[in-house]
Amino acid sequence: MAISAAQVKELRDRTGAGMMDCKKALEETNGDMELAIDNMRKSGAAKAAKKAGNIAADGTILIKNGEGFAVLLEVNCQTDFVAKDANFLGFANSVLDVAAASKVALEDLKAQFEEARVALVAKIGENINVRRVEYIDGAKLASYRHGERIGVVVTGDADDETLKHIAMHVAASKPEYVNPEDVPADVVTREQALQIEISMNEGKPADIAEKMVVGRMKKFTGEISLTGQAYIMEPKKTVGEFLKEKGAKVTNFIRLEVGEGIEKKEEDFAAEVAAQIAASKKA
């Protein structure tokens, strides 16, 4: 049976697949449109299953403000090339819109967009993963995206410009907590034990070692907290001092970076070439 251009166009419009894939699917089903769609969906699911084991550590961070809250979303792919692809970004923004509409939980988002994800994997040829969604509440919010890879939202009592600058600082300096006193007790205890051991190994007298540990702990909690860090725009001041001058306060923040915490496969190009040469000699 001859397949018409109109049939190919209809299948392409309905599936988003490539023209040649659509033509082939229609030829295999003798022009049966619905069967062609079913077969393409099955094929796409199989391709997605094969890609599921591939490490997806690239991608994008998106942010959208709602009423009294903001949502940050991370969607991953395997390469920076696909991270800029219009189809990938369209998918990610669709997920973001649904998340922002009603604070949808991550697992529910994954389930809702699984069919679209599978179709996208089949079309693009890379593993795609809706990895994280975070919500932050606040009457006053400021957001900042550094390129496509880092997203920050800060909430607090301050003017828009001040909160925006603090969001930029968070993007650059990666604080883990708002204030030094917010550092959890178990984190403090673990670091304190380490510093005591270091001081003892240095052979310091007990009274001096104790003072050294106090100083080091103050530095430690300051470096991992927002208000204790040196402010990137005025390094002689801490963020806390800058906020005090402005009569401002930060109550919370969220920072997401693409791929953080994902163990990536290290590519050794020289070893790969050597292996290929060795294999060719055996052939």
Swiss-Prot record:
- Compartments it resides in: Cytoplasm
Q: Which UniProt keywords apply?
A: Cytoplasm, Elongation factor, Protein biosynthesis
GO MF: translation elongation factor activity
**One Pfam family this sequence matches:** EF_TS
Q: Kindly indicate whether the keyword Cytoplasm belongs to this entry.
A: yes
Question: Which residue stretches belong to region Involved in Mg(2+) ion dislocation from EF-Tu?
Answer: 79-82
Q: Which domain of life is it from?
A: Bacteria
User: Mind telling me which InterPro entries this protein's record contains?
Assistant: EF-Ts_dimer_sf (IPR036402), Transl_elong_EFTs/EF1B (IPR001816), Transl_elong_EFTs/EF1B_dimer (IPR014039), Transl_elong_Ts_CS (IPR018101), UBA-like_sf (IPR009060)
One GO term describing the cellular component = cytoplasm
Please explain the role this protein plays, according to its UniProt record. Answer: Associates with the EF-Tu.GDP complex and induces the exchange of GDP to GTP. It remains bound to the aminoacyl-tRNA.EF-Tu.GTP complex up to the GTP hydrolysis stage on the ribosome.
NCBIfam families per the UniProt record, alphabetical: tsf
Which HAMAP family does the annotation name? EF_Ts
The family line of this record is:
Belongs to the EF-Ts family.
Q: What is this protein called?
A: Elongation factor Ts
Protein's gene: tsf
